[in-house]
């Protein structure tokens, strides 16, 4: 909410800490402020965005999200001195300030995407698609976290497959089953990503939730595509007791969820 943004900014500034925001979903968050906060129902998304960023000292932006491009991003600053310090690293590692390692085509697409991303008809379409998929998945028996968000539907893989313990990654197992059932690709946000050893006891600690994320590509799917995802999910749930857990056979020391290899538990 705008109130949370404002209060968080005040706390940071009270202690002399610059308040930077992760801006990758700025437009979708502005849309939710508009449709959920009565004070902003008659305020345009663009004006809501301006107010959101008025509380910040800067931002980081993965433009692959709400700028609707396939590559790129930026960092923005209010403090010109801080900008200069960061700019030196940019020149050394990425490219000059005017392009930052991106092609002209990608810069042009990013500029257009920032405008398109705050179009209210687009945001309404985007949010309604996500909401629709959430309802489709609920109807076939998947435990969906409600209300759904702007870019994805989250399913509780642990509840969907209660016979699979956390040590065998139930959300990954459900994601694999969906891919085999219908070519539906999802992402685990659970213990494959977050499991770690307690620094004091050495005990393995699992993630609080075993989530499976259904992130929806933008401006690509029709509702028939979402119905197809539901059909694949329904097939999985009919045979849920046959889905087996998984074990890691190889993993790098860091970021294992990107590169790990797993196989079914016998």
Q: What are the residue ranges of the model-derived segments?
A:
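Feature representing long, continuous alpha-helical segments
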Residues: 131, 135, 172, 176-180, ...
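Conserved PLP-enzyme active-site core in the AAT-like
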Residues: 1-144, 165-166
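Short, conserved charged micro-motifs
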Residues: 83-84, 162-170, 219-228
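Active-site loop ensemble at the mouth of alpha/beta enzyme cores that anchors a bound cofactor
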Residues: 158-185, 199-207
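Short, glycine-/Ser/Thr-/acidic-enriched flexible segments
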Residues: 65-67, 79-82, 115-117, 150-151, ...
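Conserved glycine-rich beta-strand-loop-beta hairpin in the small C-terminal domain of fold type I
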Residues: 130-131, 145-157
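PLP-dependent enzyme catalytic core of the Aspartate aminotransferase-like
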Residues: 117, 181, 193-266
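Short acidic (Asp/Glu) and glycine-rich catalytic loops that position anionic groups and cofactors
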Residues: 87-90, 107-116, 151-160, 207-213, ...
